[in-house]
């Protein structure tokens, strides 16, 4: 599988570089022959996919069709680790993904893994949209050769389990699946649970076979992964926001004309606002499905 992913990334890189380097003074014109690339590790029918596709639409609209972008969803060209690495080294120009896997490469992003820092999504969004705060966060990304264009979200992460949770003591001993993030693991350990990093593709079977007792994810993922079929309770822990970053390789961005940079920046903001609206609608819809 790694060989296949490597080949795909190499092919995509060749097209992207042709689009950007063939006429370095005017990448937008070159992009008419070869589309730019944006990738994520989620299905198209998720907020991540919506965020990605809206950006593609907005870039094409704002450029009057002069700039074309090809979206690769669902980990087609690699999982979270491969995507952030590929964006940092310039193989893939644009990436949309959760910030948690990025903290393994950009340690300062662990600020977003501080549990219980926010319990209201609107307060969090106001912070993320603050120009001064975003400038500081962007500097952290720039230290690692990528630029933060916009930050959306899938609301908060919540817990599902077959055990009724009424107090902190009820978390003790619960074998809960988490992402591979040391800060997430530390949080669950601190309240007595037994966190187990596991690929999401293994979660449904893990719950079915009893390898794990519980898991934590945004509502949308609980529904799309049919987790509710194996779990009796949703515990509204809201312990962490599920943030979605849209990043671009800094060298790629710097080769764009001033006009195209403005198009990219505005398209990212438009996609952020639209995806947040869709997220809020989908939370209500997903809750009705779970109930």
Give names to the regions the model predicted.
Residues 1-35:
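Short, low-complexity disordered leader/linker segments with a strong preference
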Residues 21-123, 132, 141-291:
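N-terminal secretory/targeting leader peptides
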Residues 137:
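Thiol/selenol-based redox catalytic cores and closely related redox-interacting motifs
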Residues 129:
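Active-site-adjacent segment of FAD-dependent monooxygenases/related oxidoreductases
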């Amino acid at each position: 599988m790694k060989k296949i992913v490597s080949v795909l990334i190499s092919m995509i890189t060749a097209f992207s570089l042709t689009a950007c380097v063939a006429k370095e003074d005017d990448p937008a014109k070159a992009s008419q022959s070869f589309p730019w690339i944006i990738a994520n590790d989620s299905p198209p029918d998720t907020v991540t996919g919506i965020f990605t596709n809206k950006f593609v639409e907005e870039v094409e609209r704002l450029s009057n069709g002069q700039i074309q972008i090809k979206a690769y969803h669902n980990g087609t060209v690699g999982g979270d680790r491969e995507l952030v690495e590929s964006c940092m080294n310039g193989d893939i120009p644009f990436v949309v993904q959760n910030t948690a896997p990025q903290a393994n490469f950009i340690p300062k992003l662990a600020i977003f893994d501080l549990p219980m820092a926010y319990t209201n999504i609107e307060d969090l969004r106001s912070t993320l949209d603050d120009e001064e705060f975003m400038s500081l966060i962007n500097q952290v990304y720039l230290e690692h050769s990528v630029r933060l264009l916009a930050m959306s979200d899938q609301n908060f992460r919540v817990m599902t389990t077959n055990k009724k949770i009424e107090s902190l003591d009820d978390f003790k001993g619960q074998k809960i699946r988490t992402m591979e993030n040391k800060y997430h693991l530390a949080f669950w350990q601190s309240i007595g649970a037994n966190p187990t990093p596991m690929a999401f593709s293994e979660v449904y079977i893990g719950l079915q076979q009893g390898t794990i007792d519980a898991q934590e994810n945004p509502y949308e993922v609980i529904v799309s992964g049919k987790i509710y079929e194996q779990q009796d309770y949703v515990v509204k822990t809201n312990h962490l926001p599920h943030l979605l970053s849209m990043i671009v390789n800094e060298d790629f961005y710097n080769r764009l004309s001033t006009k195209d940079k403005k198009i990219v920046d505005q398209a990212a903001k438009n996609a952020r606002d639209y995806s947040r609206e869709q997220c809020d609608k989908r939370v209500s819809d997903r809750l009705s499905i779970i109930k």
